[in-house]
Amino acid sequence: YGAELNDENQDITLDNFAELIDNQSWEEFMPRGVTKELFKEFIPYYDPDMFRAVGRNYRDLVRQADQLAPMERVKAVSRIFSYFRNPDKETVLTPWRVVNMHIGDCIGGYVFFDEAMETESVAPRFIDHGEVTDAVFKDRNTRILEINSKTGLYPLYMAYSVFAEKLKDYRDNHMLATDVPVDIQNQIWYNVLKDNIFVICKTEMAKSITKRTLRGFRRAKVNARYFEDLINKITNQSDMFIKKMHDGK
């Protein structure tokens, strides 16, 4: 899903899978005790064609989602994560429904489920908690920092809620009674990613996954950053930390 390939026509196979993932990301996402060396011992017991097909299918699903308007794309991308399973009890990938429950209850924004939080809504509904919701989502210059993103689903929720408010502004300013064209919606989305959403990740793969969730395979700036020795960087090199976060490098 998140792997960065030099040639996107290349397949992810049992033979190159471990090479595509840095050691820290492997340790973070794989079940405890399953080293790269141990994984190689498992290879004869996997179906190589099935492994390759599943990897390609996930990436194709993202490419299909990239053709949709932002609201529909959020639904499609979040649905992909419903196919994933937690690697082990120490590495929990928070489900999209729980993200909606958590953030919707705390600060509001656009929730993609009904009031019972059981069924996905046709269109997201806005939850307004007053001052905190206004400060986070209705301030057009808001800057939102997500710390320790693994999947990008939390910043996806935040980005959509900021995007939806800016889309309303565009519609009002242009006095549109119809839907805003998808290309303009996408440009608003890209601007939100560039100007309003900032993400810190614990590993390189978490950064790649988060970027894939937010922008897919499209060329858009995402301010996602992986830092080694994060506490030291914040404490002793704060100016450099802020610049790198803003640059998304």
Please provide the spans of the model-predicted regions.
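SAM-dependent methyltransferase catalytic region
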Residues: 1-249
